[in-house]
UniProtKB/Swiss-Prot annotation:
This is GTPase Era, mitochondrial. Residues 167-170 are annotated as: G3. InterPro entries: G_ERA_dom, GTP-bd, GTPase_Era-like, KH_dom-like_a/b, KH_dom_type_2, KH_sf_prok-type, P-loop_NTPase, Small_GTP-bd. Residues 264-296 are annotated as: Disordered. Residues 120-127 are annotated as: G1. Residues 1-43 form a transit peptide. Residues 146-150 are annotated as: G2.
Length: 437
């Protein structure tokens, strides 16, 4: 069949299928037909295991007129939400994704850019926050530590501004990396990211009462070594706190009582305003021989403090607008259609791994090897993926398959939904479990 006829047939089929999943999903897909490189997404709904209800596409927007809880805290006016922000999809074809990554950026006349590093302890919520800021789930998320195994890159492009998010693994010590035989990338990637950062977002999970009262030694060491890089503090998961007054105490502890170069009084801890910046010692230039006080628990050089719940997206949009406002004049690094630097195969493998971490107990998910054996286009234009999950113990195999194959089918179904929202295409995902010999 000729390419034009084939694409026309698939277009009719897929738009019809997507409309069943929801008119919003269909409209979003239709807006992506014209593309800079002449590529067209060739599929639209997702089939993975049993039938499922239509997905809800992630969105960074909120209803017009909805006030932010941080208005008084940060003094930020509400952005104009009259025009919806369109989030790019990721191509299902690796060569198309690679070509787009190296394509000349379609910059406006006065481009602005900002490279942001998300820093924090393992499982602080960095990937969840990155997904919410991007408006589409492209990074794996789970409650288990070390879900992010290496640095991942996401791109926000709005109007003249491009913000590049570097989602790094949680900072760990060399001793922990060696003791648990973790990949070297878990140790090195956060430090490498800091070398090109324009802004550091330090994320603290305030729902963890064991760690919330101080920054981890690894985070403090990183901030000290790169003290010339501006930083802000994001206190995450505040919705989990029953007593909001605890936030005042945590603010004082994590900032050592200083924000934006000014000492805070208890009643002033939640009144930092972005229009009253004062240069902090950290902004004066790099410290050639950074020395960290071993008794130090917080960082006194944060420019701003944000309190939010990344999971419910409460006030995430306010943080996003702040990041866009911090961008500096400079050339874009990517075309506006780039959402992430990950290949489609990497995204798929990460999403499957996310579900393994979520549903499998203890050490089981960490001992599963993944091998993609099929990544092809089906007869109707759908994306067909087949991945083998290799385990070394028969007991692990039984756990992964589940009673009557229910668990492996559920994983395939849920991953399929995620992949549809990422690729905006029909996906047939087949998972099989094999015992290593």
């Amino acid at each position: 069949m000729a390419a034009s006829s084939w694409r026309g047939a698939v277009l009719l089929r897929t738009v019809s299928g997507l409309w069943q999943a929801g008119p919003d999903a269909a409209r979003e897909w239709m807006t992506r037909l014209p593309s800079l490189l002449g590529f067209q997404q060739r599929c639209v709904s997702c089939v993975a295991g049993p039938a499922f209800s239509g997905p809800r596409l992630a969105s960074a927007s909120r209803p017009n007129g909805q006030n932010s809880a941080l208005d008084c805290f940060l003094g930020l006016s509400q952005p104009d939400n009259s025009l919806p922000f369109r989030v790019p999809a990721v191509s299902v074809h690796r060569d198309e994704q690679d070509l787009l990554l190296v394509h000349r950026p379609d910059m406006p006349e006065n481009p602005r850019v900002l490279r942001v590093v998300l820093l924090g302890a393992p499982n602080a919520g960095k990937s969840t926050l990155s997904n919410q800021l991007l408006g589409r789930k492209v990074f794996p998320v789970s409650k288990k530590v070390h879900t992010t195994r290496s640095q991942a890159l996401g791109v926000i492009t709005e109007k003249e501004t491009q913000v590049i998010l570097l989602d790094t693994p949680g900072l760990i010590s060399p001793a922990k990396q060696k003791r648990h035989h973790l990949e070297l990338s878990l140790l090195e990637d956060p430090w490498k990211s800091m070398e090109s950062a324009d802004l550091v977002v330090v994320l603290v999970d305030v729902s963890d009462k064991w760690t919330r009262n101080q920054l981890s030694p690894q985070v403090l060491r990183c901030l000290t070594q790169f003290s010339q890089v501006p930083s802000i503090l994001v206190m995450n998961k505040v919705d989990c706190l029953k007593q909001k007054s605890v936030l005042l105490e945590l603010t004082a502890a994590l900032t050592e009582g200083v924000v934006n170069g000014k000492k805070l009084k208890t009643k002033q801890a939640l009144r930092s305003r972005p229009d009253t910046h004062c240069p902090s010692p950290a902004a004066q230039g790099p410290n050639p021989q950074p020395v960290r006080d071993p008794q130090q628990m917080g960082w006194p050089h944060f420019q701003e403090i944000f309190m939010l719940s990344a999971l419910s997206q409460e006030d995430v949009k306010t943080l996003k607008q702040y990041l866009l406002a911090q961008a500096r004049p400079g050339p874009w690094e990517f075309h506006s259609e780039v959402l992430t630097s990950q290949t489609p195969e990497e995204i798929c493998a990460n999403m499957i791994r996310e579900k393994l971490l979520e549903y499998l107990p203890e050490e089981v998910p960490y001992n599963v090897q993944q091998k993609t054996v099929v990544w092809d286009e089906g007869p109707s234009g759908e994306l067909v993926i087949e991945q083998k999950l290799l385990v070394s113990k028969e007991s692990h195999m039984k756990i992964l398959i589940g009673p009557k194959g229910y668990l492996i089918a559920q994983i395939a179904q849920e991953v399929g939904r995620d992949l549809m929202n990422i690729f905006l295409c029909e996906v047939q995902l087949r998972l099989s479990v094999k015992l290593l010999k």
